[in-house]
Amino acid sequence: MFIVFYLILIIFIFIYFHVYINLKIKSNSILRKFKSEVDKTIIEINQATDRNINIIEIKIESLNRIIKEVDERIEILDQRLLGFNNSSIPGNSPSSFGSKSDGIYKSNLDYSMPTIEKNIIKESYNVRNQIILLHEQGMSFEAIAKKFKLDLGEVELIISIHRGGVHEKMDRY
């Protein structure tokens, strides 16, 4: 009788440990899945951060080029101003001012918009026009924001600026 009791006890202990070990294995697999998801999320965050850092570095380089270009233009204008002041000194004829070197100044003084951001400006202008057109067709702010992957506030700002500009133009007439 004791042998049967011990045999039944051993079987229950075996079943208990078998179930216990299976639960541990399942919880470990859940933990592994959770850890892999967290690792993937961290990798995605790192990639987004790297992308943002690269964008910021490109903007910094762009601004440095613009600053360099502006400094060169300031230096050219200073030289031109100095040349103008020197031409007003007696002995220098005003007609000779700029005759030889004016071509250099004119070629260096290009008063156009910096070429670095032209495409970005055109692209943002097209997006702005598309947003205004979609809003005028009755699309909601949320749908427009989702379509262009913009914040809701940005879309509302673009529309409100457009409305303000239209009302100002109408008030003038």
Curated annotation (Swiss-Prot):
It comes from the Bacteria. The keyword Acetylation does not apply. It is found in: Membrane. Keywords: Membrane, Transmembrane, Transmembrane helix. To T.pallidum TP0711. The keyword Metal-binding does not apply. GO terms for cellular component: membrane. This is Uncharacterized protein BB_0265. InterPro entries: DUF6115. The chain crosses the membrane at residues 1-21. Disulfide bonds: none annotated. It is a single-pass membrane protein. It comes from Borreliella burgdorferi (strain ATCC 35210 / DSM 4680 / CIP 102532 / B31).
